[in-house]
Structures are given as structure tokens and as C-alpha cells.
Amino acid sequence: VGIFPPDIGGPATFVPKITNYFQDELNYEIEILTLSDSKNLNIKDDFSIKRINRDLPIIYRWLKTIFTIYRMGKNKDLIFVNGLGTETTIANIFLKKKVIRKIVGDPVWERAYNKGKTSESFDDFQVNNHGVAMSLQKKVRNFSIKNSDVIITPSQHLKNFILDLGFKNKIEAINNGVTIPKESAKIFSNNYLNITIVSRLVSHKNIEKIIEAISDLNNPLIKLNIIGEGPELNQLQSISLKSDFKNKIIFHGKLEKKDINTIFSKTDLYIQASNYEGLPHSLLEAMSYGIPVLCTPVGECREVLGNEDRGYFLNLPVSKDDIKSKIDEIINEKNIANKKSEEGKKFVSEKYNLTNTFILYKNLFTKLLEEEDK
């Protein structure tokens, strides 16, 4: 239950991969329920999927989603939740099935930040008071999380977040995994610097600051690839059009995985400037290609990059001046950036290999199914 392509983002990318593994390797029978834009309701899928129109009136959509989860869940052994957590919790009051939920962030904080209702960090937001409406949203979130049987997080930071909410059941921190490409990107193969961002276009990703920083550098040898969609697209395009750098900023929109891989193979630097991430999937993918990465020390990113021996950190709060400074540093010390990228690829290949991730999921789900059979 939850997010699924053609929606974008790390969770949407992960679900088809784990579904394929469960079906092909473990012979699980799987049905998927997701919300989709009206234009995507009838697209052809390789899985058994029920799509509900997210453009429906919210109360009607909410009730329809709860009823559909109940109807689809009656003959299932487990419910794996990657979104629609509150709706699943309500449906499961009647289903009484075992619920495994993957938590990759806090939707309450993300909504508040993207709507300009808070400028606080992820951690500060959890402990501070933000009025009755926000407190109610937090209570609903906590109720849903606490009624899960198992929580999976991609990072220790998110595991601690769940523990701080008072969750008493089983928590597993399972790293996101990526497929390791056979060949690395051909970084710094000429004088040009191809920079890539793969992201939902929302305010807490700070893409506006990246555009401003690169525009200020005014280096004709730099090109910026922005891959993704989101509510800030028009605003970001407007900012880029006003800059002298506009012909060097390319908005690719949502791309197929093979097309993203093609761009990665020609990328010299990957930037992730978010105010918060659990463990960004696209960052791991960039590192798997041996691409130097520049990111904020948030969530699990601090562990992934270590003491900057596998990449470069931006300071918080994110500023365009710091981004400019770090890009200049990388341009002037390409040999050091090369070494960091090699260490990054090695680290990701060993710790974040998708095969290892699948094995951990297999062990967890097998144990849960054995418990159900007792």
C-alpha cells in the first residue's frame, strides 16, 4: 500500500524492485494499492495494481481508500505500507492483519515546511509546539505508527525518531540498496563540469539555491541537469530564465531509469542540498557510478560520506555561497574529488548493494509469515 510509479522519488523507485523480488524469487502473490493522477489511472502495469484517483474530493477519496484496503486485505497474510499509513491503520482495525510499515521521513514536517508553516529542522520540529492543528496531525501520525507490527527505516536516525515517538514493537533499520553498474561515470574527462540533481522539486530540497549558486559562478563550462517533477517546477524555471546561465540549465522532468543512468554516466558532480533526508536513493545511485557527491549532513548521509572521505558536505543552513565555494573547491582539486568518488563507490558497493537489501527483507518477511502460521 502506498506510493508507486509513475510517481517519483526513492520510495516509488524501491517498491517495484522489492515487488519483483518477492514475486520472482519467493513466489509471493502481491496486490498493490496506490494513488495516481487521473491521467495515469489506466496505464499498463506489470503488476496487479489498483489505482485510486488522488484528484477525488479528499473525504470521498479517503473513505474509498480505506474500504479498498479492507477489501484487498481480507485474503492477504501481510500488509506492507509505503504510504497511506493512516488509511491502512483504520482499515486494519477490522482486518487485524500484520502490518509492516516503511518510514522514510515525516510527512507532517515535510508538508509544513513545503507550505512555509515552519522553517525548523526535522529534529527541532518534533519537539517544539506548533499549535493545535499541527499537534493533531502529529497525534494522528503517532497513532498510525504505533499500530504497526513492524517498522522498517533506512537509517539509524529515523529509527531513533520512531523510538522517540514511543513505538514499542519491532523496528528494523534496513539500508536502501542500489544496483551497482558495471562501469563508472567518466568524470572530469574534459574541461566541462556536468552537474546533476535527481529530486522532487519541493522547497526543502533547496534547488533554488543550487541554481543561484551556479548562475553566480558564471562558468561557461558548467552544465546543470535537473531531473524530477514537483510543485516548485514553474518557480525554478522562472528563476533559471532570469539568469545569464539559462542555456546551461536543463529541466529534464521525470525520466525513465535508463535515461537517468545515461545522464549519470556523463555526470561529474551530484548535488543533494536538502534540509532533511532519511537516506536518499539517488545519492547512493550517483555514488555507485563513482560520481563525486556534494550533500548536506542530514539523516544517514553523514554515515555514507564519513568524515568527508567519500564526498563533500554542505553546511547547514544551506547557502548559495557555500555551494559556490564547494563547487570551486572540486573544480580546483579534481584529483582529490576523484579519490573521494572511488572510495564512495567502494563503500556503496559493499554496504548498500541491492542484493544484500533483498536478503534482509526476505529474512524479515519469512519470519513474519512463519509466525502467522503458528
Question: Which role does the model predict for each range below?
Answer:
Residues N307-K320, E329-K334:
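Conserved acidic donor-binding segment of nucleotide-sugar-dependent glycosyltransferases
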Residues I100-K139:
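Acceptor-binding helix/loop patch of EC 2.4 sugar-transfer enzymes
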Residues I66-K74, D123-I151:
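Membrane-proximal helix-turn-helix segments that form the acceptor-binding/catalytic region
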Residues G73, I145, K254-L255, T262-T267:
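Short alpha-helical donor nucleotide-sugar binding micro-motif in glycosyltransferases
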Residues I152, I187-K205, I210-I214, N225:
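Conserved donor-binding/catalytic core segment of Leloir-type glycosyltransferases
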Residues N275:
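Aromatic "clamp/platform" in nucleotide-sugar-dependent glycosyltransferases that forms part
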Residues Q237-L255:
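Nucleotide-activated donor-binding/catalytic signature segment of Leloir-type glycosyltransferases, i.e.
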Residues P292-C295:
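Short hydrophobic beta-strand element within catalytic cores of glycosyltransferases
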